[in-house]
Amino acid sequence: MAEESNKLAFPSVVDRYFTRWYKPDIKGKPCEDHCILQHSNRICIITLAECHPLLQNEKTIKSISYQISANCSRLQNKVSGKSKRGAQFLTELAPLCRISSTDGEEYTIYSCIRGRLLEVNENILQNPGLLKEKPSTEGYIAVVLPKFEESKTITEGLLSQREYEEIVQSRAALRSETVQAVY
């Protein structure tokens, strides 16, 4: 009983050390939301938001590919040294990976922020279920380091957790109105 109350009293490591930022409806695609976990040392972790279609509707992930084009694979990213030499530079709309589901849908996951790609999560290639089971921890997509000068401004186009929750609630209300209108 005491152990159960401790779980409720203490926030998770992610909630304790990271600030959640959201980018809803990437490239105008409804509900394709991304979450950016920003640490105080300015490192950002790109994940899927809770409302992303891959995490909803009992979808099963078929494959994940970091091969963006014939000449660009995020797996070829080799970073070294204090200044992170060799890291691929990303823009806000730079694709990180493509995820296919068993129902034939394909989703492109974008960087959402400008910065250097420090690492991609190769564990999800062997175990794609991590994306659904632990999207904010072991199922992350990539780690990005924004430029020092831009680290304060990268969140300008992103939503806070409270703002994002308001959008999710308005979507739910809109959906329920649509369902009621059909009947």
Curated annotation (Swiss-Prot):
GO terms for molecular function: actin filament binding; actin monomer binding. One of its GO terms (cellular component) is growth cone. One of its GO terms (biological process) is regulation of actin filament polymerization. It holds the Pfam family GCV_H. Keywords: Cell projection, Nucleus. Its main location: nucleus. May regulate actin polymerization, filopodia dynamics and arborization of neurons. Belongs to the ABITRAM family. This is Protein Abitram. It comes from Xenopus laevis.
